[in-house]
Structure formats: structure tokens, C-alpha cells
Swiss-Prot record:
Topological domains, Lumenal: 44-259, 309-403
Enzyme class: transferase
Classification lineage: Eukaryota, Metazoa, Chordata, Craniata, Vertebrata
Protein name in UniProt: GPI-N-acetylgalactosamine transferase PGAP4
Description of post-translational modifications: Glycosylated.
Species name: Pongo abelii (Sumatran orangutan)
GO biological process: GPI anchor biosynthetic process
Amino acid sequence: MSTSTSPAAMLLRRLRRLSWGSTAVQLFILTVVTFGLLAPLACHRLLHSYFYLRHWHLNQMSQEFLQQSLKEGEAALHYFEELPSANGSVPIVWQATPRPWLVITIITVDRQPGFHYVLQVVSQFHRLLQQCGPQCEGHQLFLCNVERSVSHFDAKLLSKYVPVANRYEGTEDDYGDDPSTNSFEKEKQDYVYCLESSLQTYNPDYVLMVEDDAVPEEQIFPVLEHLLRARFSEPHLRDALYLKLYHPERLQHYTNPEPMRILEWVGVGMLLGPLLTWIYMRFASRPGFSWPVMLFFSLYSMGLVELVGRHYFLELRRLSPSLYSVVPASQCCTPAMLFPAPAARRTLTYLSQVYCHKGFGKDMALYSLLRAKGERAYVVEPNLVKHIGLFSSLRYNFHPSLL
């Protein structure tokens, strides 16, 4: 007489037959240990990781960041107070270049007192230009002050060292009192003014528009030299409207839908999957090659890279300027934007045709123009500037946070 066996009982029998040496058991244990123990322990303080413990660390890290920014602001202030002014001996990088190859235009407003954001930005550019030497002789610093008030102390201080364009100099402007003009439209018009002033004053080959809370990374000039001299000679890059030098780290995950990122993510699995499979087969003394094991390690590596944070793996590209990637741009944000001169003139025309408002800032306006005008734009990865401004010039923020 035969007896029927339930599916649950059959499953239990099969599980009992599995030994610790079973491939399935080993890979299951590896998954649990990696994603349940090792990665959370190693990454719980990484700000842009899915393992980041926000409730434990965010407030403290935000306060530490603000305190460090205050110290760096004070250091930048002392730096300029001790630097010889235009009445004395001015370093060559501050002197006007007849027709520069690259104009670095820093747009500034009077921000939260004490942090001296614009001083931090300009002092870092000055230091990097000095280190760059003859290679950067065709670079020109240019400050564009769009603060309506005359009380912008940092801009006044910098005017001793850097050529300055003041949008509201010598005028009693009631621009902000016009009910039809909101802060987002004013920011766009300020941007247009600074871009146009850069072109009219210097007629350069390129204009780098930098907001006053975007500190350049150490590698910015070697990377720009490589990109503009070599990579942007390629036909599909040559006529780009702009090149973004910054994209928020929180938006750099693979799960933020960008076609090129998906291809990169699959490429990570295709690269690391076979490598980890070979390592596993070698150390586990498994004969031959297993497609299921390779599929597991491909998915394992893709999941690990995404959960730890794509941002941190992008940092490996800083080893060489040639490793930086250039991919199609998305809409956010504008801390640092590079315009070839012909594209800058097209941008001025385009921006004069749009009106910005809440929910449609200048970054979205620029991005919307790509499809409307048949233009292309790109972003370089990893970022070439650090965004240090936790206090927005558009929105009141009494409790600034890193996220």
C-alpha cells in the first residue's frame, strides 16, 4: 500500500541532504553574511549608501560639516587678508589675460554670514591655478556679483584681486519688488547676465560658470584639459550645448533611471560575475565552470555595488583623467557648467525665451531646451566640484542637512 508524501515533507528531506559543502548553502551563507552583516557594519556611516543609518548619524554629520565649513571659511578669509592686493604685487593668475582660452566665472550673492562660501571657492581656484602653472596661463578668473545690496563684504574683498562685474552697481534697483518676477526667474536672469558679461568682456573659447558654493576638486584642470583637448574633438561631443561638472551624489545610484547607467550596471555584473566565479571555483575546489554560479555572482556584485553606493565606486575613476566618463546629462543641477563660446551664445538666446518659476528653475529650463531645440548636453563623472552650500539662496532653510 503506497503512501503519499506532502510537498513540504519532500522539501524538508532535500534540505536535510544539503551539507555545508553544498554550493547552494555556501552561496546562501555568503549572501546573508555580506548583505546582513559585513556591508551594514562597513557602510553605516557612508552618506550615500543604502546602508547609511540616517537616524543615527545625519544630524551629527551635518553639524560637523557646518563646523568644518565655518573653519574653512575663516581660513579663506585670512588667506585673502594676507594676500597682496592689486596695489601691490599681484600673482600672474589674477592678471587679465588678453583673450583667454577658459574664463572661470563665479556667480555670487551675499549668503549666510560666517561661511564665506565664495572666498572658499576663489581661494581654491587660485591655489589650483598656481599649481597648474604654464598649462593654465590661458585661464581667467572672473567674479560676477549679482547681489542687489551693497553689503556683500566678500565680493568687495575679492574685487582687490579678481576682475568683477556688478549687476546692480550704481543703481537703485527695485527688481525684487516686481510682483511678476520671482526668485527663480531672477536667478535665471542673473545667470544670463553673468554668462553674457563673460563673453563680452573676454571673448573666450570656453566659459565655466561656477556658483559660489561649488569648490573645485584637485583634478579639475588636468581633467578639463584632457576632456576639451582630446575627448571633445569627437563629433558627437563637439557641438554639445554644455558639459555639467556636478550631479548630486544622491541621484547617482543605478536605480535612478538613466540608460547609460543601466548599461554600466550590467557591465559591472558581466565583469565581476566571471571574476568572482573563478575565485569561488578555485578556493572551493569546484571542477569546471557553472553558469548558475556565474549568474549568482553577477547579480551579487550588481546588488553590492548599488547598495554600497555607486558614488563611492565612481571615485576610482579619479586615478587618471582618461578614466573620467562623459554621459548624457539629466536635469539637476547647475553648480558648475562648462559652455563652449558658440553654445553659450545659443544658450543666451534660449534662456531669454523661457520664464522660470517654482518647480521650473534654470536647471530644468536648460534641460528642457535640449529636446525642444535638438541640442545635446553631457555630464562628467565623478564630479569635478564639491557642493558645500547647505544654505540655499532661493529657499529659507533654518535646519540645514546633508540630505
